[in-house]
UniProtKB/Swiss-Prot annotation:
DNA binds at R313, R318. Belongs to the RuvB family. One of its GO terms (molecular function) is four-way junction DNA binding. Transmembrane segments: none annotated. The RuvA-RuvB-RuvC complex processes Holliday junction (HJ) DNA during genetic recombination and DNA repair, while the RuvA-RuvB complex plays an important role in the rescue of blocked DNA replication forks via replication fork reversal (RFR). RuvA specifically binds to HJ cruciform DNA, conferring on it an open structure. The RuvB hexamer acts as an ATP-dependent pump, pulling dsDNA into and through the RuvAB complex. RuvB forms 2 homohexamers on either side of HJ DNA bound by 1 or 2 RuvA tetramers; 4 subunits per hexamer contact DNA at a time. Homohexamer. Forms an RuvA(8)-RuvB(12)-Holliday junction (HJ) complex. HJ DNA is sandwiched between 2 RuvA tetramers; dsDNA enters through RuvA and exits via RuvB. An RuvB hexamer assembles on each DNA strand where it exits the tetramer. Each RuvB hexamer is contacted by two RuvA subunits (via domain III) on 2 adjacent RuvB subunits; this complex drives branch migration. In the full resolvosome a probable DNA-RuvA(4)-RuvB(12)-RuvC(2) complex forms which resolves the HJ. Its main location: cytoplasm. GO terms for biological process: DNA recombination; DNA repair. The gene is ruvB. This is Holliday junction branch migration complex subunit RuvB. It comes from the Bacteria. Residues 186-255 are annotated as: Small ATPAse domain (RuvB-S). It comes from Leifsonia xyli subsp. xyli (strain CTCB07).
Length: 347
């Protein structure tokens, strides 16, 4: 992890992938595809702030990875005509990290903190006062002789992003003037995202092929753009057309099936079906069985599997649905494997 609190964690993304995604990012709300309600709400918030010549209210963006939280933060800065400062929760592990970051902001600057729920508790508590009154208290000295010195801050707009809004303490959540939950995209919206990306990349691909990619990208624009890149590479190397046959061949090569399931999705489902006889199984046990972090399974894999009806989350643990058994051509046991989904999680 970087010692610089302004450097976001990007452990799972290569520099080339980041450059590719950055080139495709929309710069305005008008260019942003999907999330129509959120776009309308943000447009109103930003327009009102400009008309009143003030900084925009603090904004919290929640939702699964890859739906556009970072892009929307960049758009907020661009449409506010203000600079953007990037940071992340894991990079802010001490109150001093946050104090240094906040005290260096210029008037009206937009501060984006990704994965804000992973920020240290001492930093969270300092952020309360900063968001509300644009000041922080700096402790000087130790023990009984310690004194608090107030430090005024330049007015700023905080944009926080989280994949797990339930982990945010209520005092922090309540200080955001606007909160939005980003939803998964439908196939029509994803086809628009892909068509825009293809034009920007000067990549000729037919509509049927785009629709096929849209159906396999888990409702997530980031995945859609990455799959488009894989199809483009395949067409380039094999010297053929970027048609539906090329899509099938490329995605089969990269283990993305017709539902959009990838290697990890299938590993999770196979573990539940075969090792645990359909479940229920706890999150930590499941994570160990597939060699993955529990947080990755909970925030990346499960939302998609639950949404397409292959997995249920119950008070006792994760359970494979009848549809999951059928998808893999297996006969479901008679009892206990078709419980309705639950928002409750196991410990």
């Amino acid at each position: 992890m970087s010692d610089d609190p302004t450097t976001p964690e990007l452990e799972s993304e290569s520099e080339s992938e980041l450059a590719f995604e950055g080139a495709l990012r929309p710069r305005t709300l008008a260019e942003f595809v999907g999330q129509a309600k959120v776009r309308g709400q943000l447009q109103l918030l930003l327009t009102a702030a400009r008309m009143q010549e003030r900084t925009a209210d603090h904004i919290l963006l929640a939702g699964p990875p890859g739906l556009g939280k970072t892009t929307l933060a960049m758009i907020v800065a661009h449409e506010s005509d203000r600079p953007l400062r990037l940071s992340s929760g894991p990079a802010i592990q001490h109150a001093g990290d946050l104090a240094a970051l906040l005290s260096s902001l210029t008037p009206g600057e937009v501060l984006f903190i990704d994965e804000i729920h992973r920020m240290a508790r001492t930093a969270e508590e300092m952020l309360y006062l900063a968001m509300e009154d644009f000041r922080i208290d700096i402790m000087v000295g130790k023990g009984a002789g310690a004194t608090s010195i107030p430090l005024d801050l330049a007015p700023f707009t905080l944009v926080g992003a989280t994949t797990r809004s339930g982990l945010l303490p209520n005092p922090l959540r309540d200080r955001f003037g606007f909160t939005a939950h980003l939803e998964f995209y439908d196939e029509g919206e994803l086809a628009q995202v892909l068509a825009r990306a293809a034009v920007m990349l000067e990549f000729e691909i037919d509509g049927e092929a785009l629709a096929e990619i849209a159906g396999r990208c888990r409702g997530t624009p980031r995945i859609a753009n990455r799959l488009l890149r894989r199809v483009r590479d395949y067409a380039l190397v094999h010297g053929g057309r970027a048609d539906i046959a090329a899509v099938h061949a490329a995605l089969e090569l990269y283990d993305v099936n017709e539902l959009g399931l990838d290697r990890l999705d299938r590993a999770v489902l196979h573990a539940i079906l075969e090792r645990f006889e359909g479940g229920p199984v706890g999150l930590n046990t499941l994570a160990v069985s597939v060699g993955e972090e529990p947080e990755t399974i909970e925030s990346v894999v499960e939302p998609f599997l639950v949404r397409i009806g292959l997995l249920s989350r119950t008070p006792r643990g994760r359970v494979a649905t009848v549809a999951a058994w059928r998808h893999f051509g297996l006969a479901a046991p008679r009892q206990g494997h078709s419980q309705p989904p639950s928002l409750m999680d196991d410990l």
